[in-house]
Structures are given as C-alpha cells and as structure tokens.
Amino acid sequence: MREAAGLEARGLKSPPILKGQDGEGSLQVHQSDDMKIEGAKVFAVYGKGGIGKSTTSSNLSAAFSKLGKKVLQIGCDPKHDSTFTLTGMLQPTVIDILKSVDFHAEELRPEDFVTQGYNGVQCIEAGGPPAGTGCGGYVVGQTVKLLKQHHLLEDTDVVLFDVLGDVVCGGFAAPLQHADRALIVTANDFDSIYAMNRIIAAVQAKSKNYNVRLAGCVANRSKDTDEVDRYCDVVGFKRIGHMPDVDAIRRSRLKKKTLFEMPDEEDIVQCRAEYIRLAEKLYAGTDPLAPAPLEDRDIFELLGFD
C-alpha cells in the first residue's frame, strides 16, 4: 500500500498484476482450436540442458518406428541438433527456411523443411529465435501451423517434441499446449533433479488449462537411480525408464546414428530393448501423474549437502 501511495504521489500508476491463463505472472496466449494436433499421441521431452534429451528423443522415435508407428520428431532448440542421429546431418530450421522465402509459407513444399530419417521417422527442426530476441513459443507455433497447412500431421501416429534445456518460460512451455504426456529426462544427481522439480511445476501449471499430464521420468546416463527414486517417492512421481551410462550411446552420437543402427554388442542390445519397452509403455498409455513439486529449501534438505 505504501509503495502504491508513493507512486501515485509522483503521478505514476501501480504496475499491473499479471494474471494469464496459467495463473499470476503468466502472459501465455491460449492456442486456437485449429492448431490442435489431433489423431496422434503427442509427447514433449524436457530435462536439464546437456542431460541427453536429444539422444533419448531420437532413440525413442526410432523405437516407436520399430513398433510400426509413423513418427514425427520436432526439435525445439536453436542448436537444431535434435534429429542429428536420425538423419545423419544438421537440418536447417523452420525459421531459417521461412526467412529464405520472406515468411511466405505458401511457397514451401514439405521436403523443404521435413527430412526423412532412420526407419521412416519424419524429422523437423523448429529452431529458435536469435539469442536475446523473440520467443521460442512463436517458433513452435509457426512450425505446427506449417505442418497443419501441408496436412503432415494427418497420418502420423506419434509426435515427439524435443524441447530446449530446462527453460520453463511461457515460450518454451508451448509444446505442452499440444502434448498428451510430458516426459522428463534426468540423471541421478542434484542438479538434474532440481531442474526436474522446476519442470514438474511448469507442467502442473499448464495442466490446469491443457490436456497435458506427466508420464514420468527417465534416468539417463546413470549407473544408479537411488536419488531419482528417493525424490519420486517424496513428491509422488515415477521413474519409467533407466538408460545406463554406457560408452555405446556416446559412440552412436559421434557416428551420427541411433542405437538401432549400431553393431549388435551386448550393451547396445540391452539399451535398444529398454527403448522399445519404454516406447511400448508410452504408446499403450501411462497413468497421469500429479506430483507436488518441492520448494527449493526442501530439495536441498532431501538431496543436498550434509
């Protein structure tokens, strides 16, 4: 009250209270009904930056394709390397391609922005705005709009969004507007679990207005899962996958390949089987989870330093 009176005395107005669709502080714009993805199961993959989301997403897309599903993977990162192991190359981004035609989308053909990758997986890199400018939500929206205009979602069984780092602003939370389930990639360490906790809070905020629900988490590049499991037990979450820390996964990325294209070594075969199991579980449908994210202080007490 004192602050408001001081502003009025100087002829200034109090700052507005921002309250959007997702609660106080939100300016998230509600998507129009004609932008909804229908007929496909839609997953959004999140996690701490550098945790292996793109590797996980690409191998999961390959696993879905091995189950006979028609898959579309959408990379949502300015690095545009989400589909790198599926296509064996860095694709140009949707935004770069639109710039080349002065944003006249009607001049584009599907082959201009979609590349067919391993085992028929359709790959697209949405990209992102230049550093410090624009909004990732706009990029995702333009990509979905382009796919709808070219009817590329009509015969698709699975759409998988691979989303930039652990950014949980309204823009990079945009894929949650389209997703049925959100999957979090984590590791058995404090920083990864801390990021997962923030992502859970973001998904829970979105679930008030959209259909998205949490499917669970995958412990990636982790020998053990005790810290992940301890966190999940406390907040009411679930680990639904575990990818061990094996060198074969690193080597597959260096060779620009998914694990399904690598030699039949024992550790590779085991990892493939885990991806197939995870794909089967996700496609069959997982129970919607509603964990209660912890306050920062509580995470430190649970997993932090003694």
From Swiss-Prot:
Keywords: 4Fe-4S, ATP-binding, Bacteriochlorophyll biosynthesis, Chlorophyll biosynthesis, Iron, Iron-sulfur, Magnesium, Metal-binding, Nucleotide-binding, Oxidoreductase, Photosynthesis. Pathway: Porphyrin-containing compound metabolism; bacteriochlorophyll biosynthesis (light-independent). Its EC number is 1.3.7.7. It comes from the Bacteria. ATP binds at G50, I51, G52, K53, S54, T55, K79, N220, R221. It catalyses: chlorophyllide a + oxidized 2[4Fe-4S]-[ferredoxin] + 2 ADP + 2 phosphate = protochlorophyllide a + reduced 2[4Fe-4S]-[ferredoxin] + 2 ATP + 2 H2O. GO terms for biological process: light-independent bacteriochlorophyll biosynthetic process; photosynthesis, dark reaction. Its cofactor is [4Fe-4S] cluster. CDD domains: Bchl-like. Pfam families: Fer4_NifH. Mg(2+) binds at S54. Gene3D superfamilies: P-loop containing nucleotide triphosphate hydrolases. [4Fe-4S] cluster binds at C135, C169. PROSITE patterns: NIFH_FRXC_1, NIFH_FRXC_2, NIFH_FRXC_3. GO terms for molecular function: 4 iron, 4 sulfur cluster binding; ATP binding; metal ion binding; oxidoreductase activity, acting on iron-sulfur proteins as donors; oxidoreductase activity, acting on the CH-CH group of donors, iron-sulfur protein as acceptor. Binds 1 [4Fe-4S] cluster per dimer. Belongs to the NifH/BchL/ChlL family. Homodimer. Protochlorophyllide reductase is composed of three subunits; BchL, BchN and BchB. HAMAP family: ChlL_BchL (MF_00355). Component of the dark-operative protochlorophyllide reductase (DPOR) that uses Mg-ATP and reduced ferredoxin to reduce ring D of protochlorophyllide (Pchlide) to form chlorophyllide a (Chlide). This reaction is light-independent. The L component serves as a unique electron donor to the NB-component of the complex, and binds Mg-ATP. PANTHER family: LIGHT-INDEPENDENT PROTOCHLOROPHYLLIDE REDUCTASE IRON-SULFUR ATP-BINDING PROTEIN. This is Light-independent protochlorophyllide reductase iron-sulfur ATP-binding protein. The lineage of its organism: Bacteria, Pseudomonadati, Pseudomonadota, Alphaproteobacteria, Rhodobacterales.
